A protein has these predicted regions:
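Structured secondary-structure scaffolds
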Residues: 1-148, 192-194
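Short, solvent-exposed segments of well-ordered alpha helices
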Residues: 4, 122-133, 162-165, 181-188, ...
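Conserved, charged catalytic cores of large soluble enzymes
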Residues: 20-22, 26-28, 139-178, 198, ...
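A glycine-rich phosphate-binding loop feature that marks nucleotide/adenosyl-phosphate handling sites
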Residues: 71-73, 122-123, 157-162, 196, ...
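Residue-level signal for cytosolic alpha-helical hairpin/rod architecture
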Residues: 87, 120, 171-176, 232
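Short, charged, low-complexity loops and linkers
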Residues: 92-93, 118-129, 149-160, 176-186
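Generic structural concept
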Residues: 132, 136, 168, 172, ...
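Basic, alpha-helical terminal appendages of large translation-related enzymes
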Residues: 180, 185-186, 195-283
Length: 283
């Protein structure tokens, strides 16, 4: 009827269900709907929390299990605006630093439900601190020592000491903690839990100093390196949704064929592979 037009949001909202097979592929639609999380910007909350549920209920379609409104990225303390010229092009960041570090920063820095501030200074600080110093450097230390002292073969862990058991137990409980945080949309806290574990493993390496221990007790040093390597593998698996490309490189470097989140999947005797620095430090 040429006398009537469709409200643009009415037409747009329907795409959420038609895109996953509504009225076209029942099996596909049933596998996707109702969605667990409907993540939207806070500026379109009314559209998604009032109009959309009304449309679904009138059609007899189940509502999303939750609707979560995220905040805005600010440039410093101001909303990004072309007229102000304070817009950062994420593609430029990706060209300079890679997509995974950008993904990591955005998910680590934003508290979902609140606005977050972007500055190049905070991006570089987060990259160097978390990724270059903590995560990437741990892989470099472990792989270098194994290649130098164990013919690049993952050493046998042998019998665990108390400090080893602590790393193992923390690693085993990590996935359940992460699952709870993600279910509550606390992604930044979930990422920080993993990074805290990586920092704990770095301290474990410092306390045991396998670069010194290997000169006196090669078996004991091998145990330390196995524990640290397995903790790295587990951390990479948990971080893979955030940084799929870089964690894949790490897992390949460790010859880790298993992405299971249970402990002890590194296979002694497997040969480590050469790799480029995982996160070259930004000068």
């Amino acid at each position: 009827d040429s006398d009537y037009v469709t409200y643009v949001w009415f037409d747009a909202l329907i795409n959420y269900i038609t895109a996953v097979g509504f009225k076209e592929d029942k099996d596909q639609f049933d596998s996707w709907w109702p969605v667990s999380y409907h993540l939207i910007g806070k500026d379109i909350l009314t559209t998604h929390a009032v109009y959309w549920p009304t449309m679904l209920l009138s059609a007899g379609i189940q509502l999303p299990q939750s609707i979560f409104a995220h905040g805005w990225w600010l440039m410093g303390e101001s909303k990004m605006s072309k007229s102000l010229g304070n817009v950062i092009n994420p593609m430029d960041l990706i060209d300079d630093y890679g997509v995974d570090p950008v993904r990591y920063y955005l998910m680590r820095e934003m508290v979902l439900g609140h606005d977050s501030s972007f500055t190049m200074e905070s991006f570089i600080q987060r990259y160097n601190s978390d990724l270059a110093n903590d995560f990437g450097n741990l892989l470099s230390r472990v792989s270098t020592l194994i290649k130098k002292n164990y013919d690049a073969r993952i050493p046998e862990p042998g019998d665990y000491l108390e400090s080893d058991i602590q790393i193992k137990m923390k690693g085993e409980s990590l996935s359940s903690q992460i699952e709870i945080l993600i279910a509550d949309m606390r992604l930044n806290e979930a990422i920080e839990e993993i990074m805290q574990y990586i920092r704990t493993v770095n301290k474990y390496m410092e306390d045991n100093a396998p670069w010194k221990l290997v000169k006196e007790d090669k078996i004991a040093a091998g145990r330390v390196l196995y524990i640290a390597g397995e903790a790295l593998r587990l951390s990479a698996v948990l971080l893979s949704p955030v940084m799929p490309h870089r964690t894949s490189i790490l897992l390949d470097a460790l010859s880790a064929r298993d992405t299971d989140i249970s402990w002890g999947k590194l296979i002694p005797g497997d040969i480590l592979k050469d790799h480029e620095p995982l996160f070259p430090r930004i000068k």
